[in-house]
Regions:
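Acidic/glycine-enriched connector segments
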Residues: 2-165
Length: 165
């Protein structure tokens, strides 16, 4: 996995996703529909670059949704923000297959570190916030974890957060 495109992207035309790794799977299709609507609204408002951290759960679902919408939305770009090389090494087989397929289809892959380190996921979240004009979230209100950190950081920076929960 490597950065395939050396293009810098326009923050004003970028959205980042954040959400929980685990969610009520009976709501999967409802969540996917909400993601799809939010992505199309963002696209209709001029957003072209959609940044996913490619973690299991909402991140991969968001990446899948962007990928499925690209054919009908010219210029839509999927950017993978990977915290460290080998991120998917501990994923369950199904999630690993999904990750591998999506990485191959991503328009840009940005690997932030060659190796894992304790703060790498938070640094990835901060990278996404600092490179997005808006955050699309699936957040249940818990005041801990990466999703909470990402939303808090975005709000501190005055970045709009759309919560699909």
């Amino acid at each position: 996995m490597k950065k395939r495109n050396n293009n810098s992207f326009d923050r004003a035309k970028s959205v980042a996703f954040t959400g929980h790794r685990y969610y009520d799977f009976s709501r999967k299709e409802i969540i996917r529909q909400r993601l799809s609507r939010a992505i199309v609204v963002a696209y209709d408002n001029g957003i072209r670059n959609f940044i996913s951290g490619f973690a299991t759960g909402i991140d991969l679902m968001a990446a899948q949704t962007v990928q499925s919408l690209k054919l009908s939305h010219p210029g839509m770009v999927l950017t993978a923000a990977i915290p460290f090389r080998g991120q998917a090494g501990r994923f369950k087989p199904h999630d690993r297959r999904c990750y591998d397929e999506l990485i191959e289809k991503a328009d840009e892959v940005i690997v932030l570190s060659e190796h894992y380190y304790p703060r790498c996921f938070l640094d990835r979240d901060e990278f996404m916030v600092c490179n997005a004009a808006q955050i699309i979230a699936y957040y249940d209100g818990r005041e801990r974890g990466g999703t909470y950190y990402t939303i808090r950081k975005a709000r501190e920076m005055g970045i709009s957060v759309t919560n699909l929960y």
